[in-house]
Design a protein with these regions (language model features):
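Non-catalytic terminal/accessory segments
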Residues: 1-252
Length: 252
C-alpha cells in the first residue's frame, strides 16, 4: 500500500515541468495502467467472482483486459440486473461506464435461431480489443462458433497509420522503407492473424501495396512506376511479407 501511495503522489513531467498529482492516477505516469488494473481487480474482478457468480442461477463469465471487458450471462434478465448493479458499484468507487460502449445483446449458439423465430435480424456483433465478434458456424456449417475479424474502426486506423508513415518517409532509401513496412506488417499479422481473420489480414497487405504504389510515385516530380514495374518489378526486388494465421483460437 505504501508503494501504491507513492505512485499516486509521484506526479508527472509536462513540458519539462513537474506537476503534482491532485487526484487519482496521474495521466502520463508509467504506473497509471498498473494502478488502474489493481483498482479494477478489486472493484470488478473479485466482486464478480465472489458475489455476482454466486447469485446468478445461470452461467456467467467476465473477460477483462485493462479497462475493456465483456460479461457473458446465460439469462438475459440476470444481465440486465448486473448492468444496473455494475453502474451503482462503479459510481460508488468513482468510476463510470462508457455509454457508447455499454450494451446488452443476444449472442451465442441459440441467438440466430431465436431471433429468426421472432422475425428479427441476425444477431448483433460487438467489438473487443480490436476485433469484431460475431455469431457464425464451423466450416461444415454444422455447429455454432464464435467468429472474429478485425474491427472496421481498428482496420481504418491501422491503414491510416501506415499511410502517414509511408507518406512521411517516402524519400528514404527503398531498402529501408520496405524493411520497415515489413516490420509493421509482421506486427499486424502477429496480432490480427487469428482463426477466421485471413481475409482481413490479406486485405491489409493489399491496401499497404496500393499505399506504397501511390507514395513511391510521389518521391519526385516524374512518375516513377507503372502498375507493371511496381507489382512485377519493385515488389519482386523488395517482397512484402505474406500474411499467415499465427494463432489458432480453437485448436491447441
Amino acid at each position: 500500500l505504501e508503494i501504491i501511495e507513492k505512485f499516486l503522489k509521484a506526479g508527472v513531467m509536462e513540458n519539462g515541468k513537474y506537476l503534482d498529482s491532485e487526484r487519482g492516477t496521474p495521466q502520463g505516469n508509467g504506473a497509471s495502467p498498473i494502478l488502474a488494473n489493481i483498482y479494477l481487480h478489486y472493484v470488478l474482478d473479485n466482486w464478480f467472482d465472489v458475489i455476482v457468480k454466486r447469485q446468478c442461477k445461470g452461467e456467467c463469465y467476465l473477460i477483462r483486459y485493462c479497462d475493456d471487458f465483456v460479461c457473458c450471462f446465460q439469462n438475459q434478465y440476470e444481465a440486465e440486473i448486473f448492468k444496473q448493479r455494475l453502474e451503482e458499484r462503479f459510481a460508488k468507487y468513482g468510476l463510470e461506464l462508457a455509454g457508447e460502449k455499454t450494451k446488452i445483446l443476444e449472442f451465442g449458439r441459440f441467438a440466430r435461431h431465436n431471433r429468426k423465430a421472432r422475425g428479427e435480424r441476425k444477431p448483433d456483433t460487438f467489438d473487443f480489443l480490436g476485433f469484431t465478434f460475431y455469431c457464425g458456424m464451423d466450416g461444415k456449417r454444422e455447429f455454432f462458433r464464435c467468429r472474429v475479424k478485425t474491427s472496421k474502426k481498428k482496420f481504418r486506423s491501422k491503414i491510416k497509420a501506415m499511410k502517414e508513415w509511408i507518406k512521411a518517409h517516402r524519400a528514404m532509401p527503398l531498402e529501408l522503407i520496405f524493411k520497415t513496412v515489413n516490420a509493421k506488417l509482421r506486427g499486424h499479422y502477429q496480432y490480427y492473424g487469428v482463426t477466421d481473420n485471413t481475409r482481413e489480414v490479406k486485405n491489409f497487405l493489399v491496401q499497404t501495396k496500393w499505399l506504397l504504389y501511390k507514395w513511391m510515385n510521389r518521391r519526385s516530380q516524374k512518375r516513377s512506376y507503372t502498375l507493371d514495374t511496381f507489382f512485377n518489378g519493385l515488389l519482386r526486388t523488395f517482397p512484402l511479407l505474406e500474411p499467415s494465421i499465427k494463432v489458432s483460437l480453437f485448436y491447441r
